[in-house]
């Protein structure tokens, strides 16, 4: 409108995000929190076949040159923080080529995660569960991201409290995974999970963290699968066993 043209004649402040396309994933990076709002992947049995010479030991954590320097997360932000640089789109999902794997090590794809008991264990096993779904389903769509959830205090008031590494990188209180699989005849099933960013006993059933899609949407401000009639979506955990295993090929 003419009014908005006048107001924004010197510039539009923007959406505080960068949408970036990689070889094995897409990402919406949140410039304020310096973590991804979401990453999206399409996994298949073929996409998970390891290419010749692909080795995660050849990959190095690095700043994302596609994010303006003012808004980047840096190696210094994470150094000595006590938190792992946790992949949102896992390296273990990007095994087709070395560049694909290298791209998962951009810091834009990292969120600060508790290491022992979470990033290196339960969360890694959940990543393995997502990969294992390709044995049963032709296509597996996975969306992953951080959440900052409120807690209720003794005074009955809700607050959101989280660390910020070096005053730059927000440490999420929780993380979500939303998974979509086909069930034939243009039907689909989904699973949505919200996990706390803390050590989780390996024996804890994955279904303890199962939530409704709208729970993730309300907490994240995102909308998933708006090109589908979500009221018709089946339950992933009815279509297959939703469980994590320490032998499930997890990936930190």
Swiss-Prot record:
Predominant cellular place of this UniProt entry's protein: secreted
Alphabetized InterPro entries for the sequence: DNA/RNA_endonuclease_AS, DNA/RNA_non-sp_Endonuclease_sf, Endo_G_ENPP1-like_dom, ENPP1-3/EXOG-like_nuc-like, His-Me_finger_sf, Non-specific_endonuclease
Query: What EC identifiers does the entry list?
Result: 3.1.30.-
Superkingdom as given in the UniProt entry:
Eukaryota
One GO location term (cellular component) = extracellular region
Q: Which residues form the active site?
A: 87
Annotated compartments? Secreted
Q: What PROSITE patterns does UniProt report for this protein, alphabetically?
A: NUCLEASE_NON_SPEC (PS01070)
Molecular function terms from GO: metal ion binding; nucleic acid binding; RNA endonuclease activity; single-stranded DNA endodeoxyribonuclease activity
Q: Which Gene3D superfamilies match?
A: Extracellular Endonuclease, subunit A (3.40.570.10)
What keywords tag this UniProt record? Endonuclease, Hydrolase, Magnesium, Manganese, Metal-binding, Nuclease, Secreted
User: A Gene Ontology biological process annotation?
Assistant: apoptotic DNA fragmentation
- Entry's SMART domains? Endonuclease_NS (SM00892), NUC (SM00477)
Q: Name one Pfam family in it.
A: Endonuclease_NS
Per its UniProt record, the required cofactor names are: Mg(2+); Mn(2+)
Binding residues annotated for Mg(2+), in chain numbering:
119
**General function of this protein:** This enzyme has both RNase and DNase activity.
Please share what else the UniProt entry notes about this protein.
Answer: The active site contains 1 hydrated divalent metal cation that has only 1 direct interaction with the protein; all other interactions are via water molecules.
Query: To which protein family does this belong?
Result: Belongs to the DNA/RNA non-specific endonuclease family.
The name under which this protein is listed is Nuclease C1
* Species assigned in the record: Cunninghamella echinulata var. echinulata
